[in-house]
């Protein structure tokens, strides 16, 4: 089977599989804040992220998942050469050149999915968690900032801060369903400090010290949100409304998770309130880039 054929069938999350990005989230709701002539490019980036993550989240055997993700990396080579073979990469062809999307960040999205597919994200060391959030969250925000016209060093630093904070927050949000599917984003250092020793990822959810293990992750997310807020004025004006809305929506989510405490891991993950998100989009649309 050729690489492009494999990439054309990346696989989706099968029945009962954990899907980490399947539902509508703040990124989707904030899309109206992206200028109309750039919105298609933003959707193409989000679609690529969804395609590769669907491979990791699917029910296929681990070697098959990793093979498909390797094929996606070859497909990025084809995209760069002007020969994309999948609907997603065809949609990325014009944005790649028009908005100078960094190929390395597209590849980082694939590498993050490979960490999921390869079983790395089960009580990973702190260094691996940091690498994962950089590849999955940082890469995504850097790509979206590029779509919005800012490929500067300042935008890159902002993207790393917001991407890490955003991804840590969504990992905490999805802690329950992920653990029941055999994943656990909490770093092993935090689990050890909290005194959690469990035979399975699902058992961690019932441990009375779960809040203590989550606290350092939440604290890091909060610190990185603060970093992103300080850096936002350095980002190009046209990019700010969308990025500010995404930042604030995920900050609100982190506060919701903190209020729910240990219950956040055993209850259905909270989704952003549609009315609140719509109001935020309208507020930022009228507020503009100020």
Segments predicted by a language model, with ranges:
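Catalytic cores of Mg2+-dependent Asp-rich isoprenoid enzymes
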Residues: 1-166, 172, 176-290
């Amino acid at each position: 089977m050729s690489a492009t054929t494999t990439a054309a069938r990346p696989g989706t999350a099968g029945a009962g599989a954990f899907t980490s990005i399947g539902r509508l989230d703040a990124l989707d709701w904030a899309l109206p804040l992206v200028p109309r002539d750039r919105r298609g490019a933003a959707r193409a980036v989000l679609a690529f992220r969804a395609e590769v993550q669907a491979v990791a989240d699917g029910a296929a055997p681990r070697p098959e998942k990793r093979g498909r993700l390797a094929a996606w990396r070859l497909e990025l080579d084809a995209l760069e050469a002007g020969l994309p073979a999948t609907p997603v990469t065809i949609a990325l062809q014009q944005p790649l050149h028009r908005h100078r999307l960094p190929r390395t960040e597209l590849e980082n999205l694939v590498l993050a999915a490979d960490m999921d597919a390869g079983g790395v994200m089960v009580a990973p060391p702190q260094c691996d968690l940091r690498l994962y959030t950089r590849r999955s969250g940082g890469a995504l925000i850097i790509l979206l900032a590029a779509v919005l016209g800012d490929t500067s060093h300042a935008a890159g630093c902002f993207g790393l801060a917001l991407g890490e904070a955003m991804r840590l927050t969504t990992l905490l949000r999805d802690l329950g369903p992920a653990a029941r599917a055999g994943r656990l984003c909490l770093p092993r250092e935090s689990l050890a400090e909290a005194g959690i020793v469990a035979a399975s990822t699902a058992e961690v959810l019932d441990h009375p010290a779960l809040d203590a293990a989550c606290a350092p992750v939440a604290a890091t997310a909060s610190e990185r949100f603060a970093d992103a807020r300080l850096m936002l004025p350095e980002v190009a004006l046209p990019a700010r409304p969308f990025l500010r809305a995404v930042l604030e929506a995920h900050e609100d989510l982190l506060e919701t998770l903190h209020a729910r405490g240990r219950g956040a891991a055993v209850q259905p993950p909270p989704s952003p309130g549609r009315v609140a998100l719509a109001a935020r989009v309208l507020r930022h649309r009228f507020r503009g880039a100020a």
